[in-house]
Design a protein with these regions (language model features):
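Non-catalytic terminal segments and appended small domains
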Residues: 1-166
Length: 166
């Protein structure tokens, strides 16, 4: 297997370099780099009546990693929620998937929010060194778009949102 060399700059001496949790892990872990604890507030969804919009009453918490990456041209870093956060604490990335472009050189940060409105404390405390997300760096194909009057036919056609089965 070819290994992609990625340069990483510690913006904080206490930042933790990314590591893979196991030999077969698809993603590497990103760690919180915090001087103090941070609390991740929940979204209070309350009762939603027909015609009402769902409004967030708490804001997401941005947690820095203390790291900047030099992602090779033609690649992108994708940041995902950790599965344990979702299953155990209902914590997720507020933007679902983070996208770090190859020309970005600033600190990689993660925006976390908890949907656990049943929790007594309604917050999750994140401490320095906690694993806050997982990420992978993948090749990004160059794409050229071609406008056409008609697209080719498929069995699925225009069916979307559950049209392929349960």
């Amino acid at each position: 297997m070819d290994v992609l060399n990625v340069k990483v700059q510690k913006l904080n001496r206490d930042a933790i370099l990314p590591v893979y949790a196991s030999q077969g892990a698809a993603c590497f872990d990103l760690h919180a780099c915090l001087p103090d604890e941070a609390e991740v507030d929940h979204y209070d969804v309350g009762r939603i009546n027909e015609g009402e919009s769902r409004r967030a009453t708490k804001e997401a918490t941005v947690v820095g990693t203390g790291l900047a990456f030099e992602i090779p041209a033609g690649h992108v870093m994708l940041i995902f929620s950790r599965s344990g956060h979702g299953f155990k604490n209902q914590v997720r990335l507020s933007n679902c998937v983070g996208v770090i472009d190859s020309d970005y050189r600033g600190e990689v940060k993660v925006s976390l929010v908890s949907d656990n409105h049943k929790a007594q404390s309604k917050t999750l405390t994140v401490k320095h060194g906690d694993r806050i997300a997982q990420a992978m760096i993948v090749p990004l194909p160059a794409v050229q778009f071609e406008e056409v009057p008609v697209l080719s036919e498929t069995d699925r056609g225009r069916g979307g949102f559950g049209s392929t089965g349960n």
